[in-house]
Curated annotation (Swiss-Prot):
PANTHER family attached to this UniProt entry: OUTER DENSE FIBER PROTEIN 3-LIKE PROTEIN 1, SHIPPO-1-RELATED
Disulfide bonds listed in the record: none
Keywords: Repeat
UniProt protein name: Protein CIMAP1C
Pfam families (UniProt xref): SHIPPO-rpt
InterPro entries: CIMAP, SHIPPO-rpt
Renumbered ranges of STPGR repeats: 200-225, 236-261
Lineage: Eukaryota, Metazoa, Chordata, Craniata, Vertebrata
Gene: CIMAP1C
Length: 275
C-alpha cells in the first residue's frame, strides 16, 4: 500500500513505541501483525503480598496484633541454688531511678601539716660520695625498697556474701505475686476408694449361663467352608510372550510417527453444532 499524504508510523498499544523515523512518501511500508499471545508478562507469583505474620514488613492494610517475645526457660538450679551472684550484680542502694540519693558527706582524712614548712630535702640530704662520673662504665645495680604493707583487713562482709531474695513464689513481701494453689494428698476418708471389707465385690463373680438353670435350646455346629478344587498347573504369563517377531504374519514391525510441535497461538477449530 502506498502513502499519499506524508508518512505515518502505526503504534500498537501492546508494545512500547519505537523511535519515529522519517520514511519517504514513495516507499511502501510493510506492516507485521502483532500476536497478542506472544507478549508475555509476569505471573501472579511475581507480585508478592506483604506478610501478615509478625511485625517486620507487615501489611499496612491489615491490623497488627501485639507481639510477645519468647525467652529461654529457667532451669531449676537457678531457683534452688543457694549461691548468690558475683559483685558485678550488686545493686547500689544509693542509685534510684531519679539519680543518686545521698546525704551530705564530709571526707575524713589525715591532718594537714604546716604549709609554711618546706618539705623539700636540703642539700645535705644528698650523698654525692657514692655517685660515679657519668662517663664511667659500671655494672647494673638494683635497689631494694620497703616491703609493701598488707591490705587492711575489713571486718565487713563482701558483696558476694549477701544472698538476693528469690523473685519467684508468694513468700516475698516486696513483690506483687499471683495467687498460688497447693495440691494436697488424697483424702482417705471415702469408703469407695478403699477396700474396707477386704473381700471381692459382685463384679468379681461371673454370671452363669441360662442353660444351666433353664431348658437348653438346640445347638448347631458351624464347620468351615471347603474350598473349590482349583487347577494349579503352571501357565505362562504376559511377560513370557515375545511380541517383537511379528514379521511372520506382518511385513514390518509397528512404528510410531512423531509429528511437529504445533504453535501455542494456533486457534482451535470450533464447529457450531445446531441441535
Amino acid at each position: 500500500m502506498k502513502q499519499s499524504k506524508g508518512s505515518r508510523n502505526y503504534v500498537f498499544y501492546a508494545q512500547h513505541p519505537e523511535k519515529e523515523e522519517e520514511v519517504p512518501s514513495w516507499h511502501e511500508i510493510k506492516q507485521t501483525p502483532v500476536i497478542m499471545a506472544t507478549i508475555k508478562g509476569p505471573g501472579p507469583a511475581k507480585y508478592l503480598r506483604s506478610s501478615c505474620t509478625g511485625y517486620i514488613a507487615h501489611d499496612i492494610s491489615m491490623f497488627q496484633e501485639p507481639a510477645y517475645s519468647l525467652h529461654t526457660r529457667h532451669t531449676k538450679k537457678r531457683i534452688i541454688d543457694i549461691n548468690s551472684p558475683g559483685p558485678c550484680y550488686f545493686l547500689n542502694p544509693k542509685v534510684t531511678r531519679f539519680g543518686i540519693s545521698t546525704c551530705p558527706q564530709v571526707p575524713m582524712e589525715e591532718r594537714i601539716s604546716n604549709p609554711r614548712i618546706n618539705c623539700m630535702p636540703a642539700s645535705c640530704k644528698y650523698n654525692l660520695e657514692k655517685t660515679r662520673p657519668s662517663g664511667e662504665r659500671q655494672p647494673p645495680q638494683y635497689t631494694f625498697g620497703y616491703r609493701c604493707p598488707y591490705r587492711v583487713m575489713d571486718p565487713n562482709p563482701a558483696p558476694n556474701q549477701y544472698q538476693l531474695p528469690v523473685t519467684l513464689g508468694t513468700n516475698i513481701p516486696v513483690f506483687r505475686a499471683a495467687p498460688s494453689y497447693s495440691l494436697a494428698s488424697t483424702n482417705k476418708n471415702w469408703f469407695h476408694k478403699e477396700n474396707i471389707a477386704g473381700g471381692p465385690g459382685p463384679a468379681m463373680h461371673t454370671r452363669p449361663e441360662p442353660s444351666v438353670y433353664q431348658n437348653r435350646s438346640p445347638l448347631f455346629s458351624m464347620a468351615k467352608r471347603f474350598g473349590c478344587p482349583l487347577d494349579h498347573t503352571h501357565r505362562p504369563g504376559p511377560g513370557s510372550h515375545d511380541i517383537q517377531p511379528v514379521t511372520v504374519h506382518k511385513p514390518r514391525i509397528p512404528a510410531f510417527t512423531m509429528g511437529i510441535k504445533h504453535s501455542p497461538h494456533l486457534c482451535p477449530l470450533i464447529v457450531d453444532i445446531c441441535d
